[in-house]
């Protein structure tokens, strides 16, 4: 769905998907975490997709300042959906931590370090992250490390 929304918007502006450079961070992290579902849940939805929660509001503000309300609305839809994606990853991460007898917040920090993962984007979208399952204490600890 997100691909179709973005592609439709790009086409309405005279472009298409693939016309602009993009990073492969999600795919690269998925490859790095092959074989460890706990690391995958920590670092794909809880880190990289959560970074999208943080990055979206500033991008929306820039689009709105440029008068591109249609693109900002597309990002509203995606942001709402991504909260659910991050939340699903959070629930699986916490379940797997419980199954392995691991404390989630320290495990998350350990995995960030072990995989040399990028840090959260600041300012963090705390409301979206809380809705997705992060605790206020965890957000405070992450903010200190950034």
Protein language model features and the residues they cover:
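Non-heme di-metal
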Residues: 1-146
């Amino acid at each position: 769905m997100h691909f179709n929304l973005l592609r439709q918007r790009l086409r309405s502006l005279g472009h298409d998907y693939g016309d602009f450079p993009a990073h492969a961070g999600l795919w690269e992290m998925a490859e790095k975490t092959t074989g460890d579902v706990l690391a995958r849940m920590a670092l794909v939805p809880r880190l990289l997709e959560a970074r999208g929660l943080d990055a979206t509001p500033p991008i929306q503000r820039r689009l709105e300042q440029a008068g591109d309300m249609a693109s900002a609305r597309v990002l509203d839809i995606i942001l709402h959906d991504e909260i659910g994606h991050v939340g699903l990853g959070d629930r699986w991460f916490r379940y797997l931590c419980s199954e392995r007898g691991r404390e989630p917040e320290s495990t998350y920090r350990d995995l960030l370090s072990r995989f040399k993962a990028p840090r959260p984007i600041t300012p963090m979208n705390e409301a979206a992250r809380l809705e997705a399952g992060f605790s206020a204490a965890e957000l405070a600890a992450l903010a200190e490390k950034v």
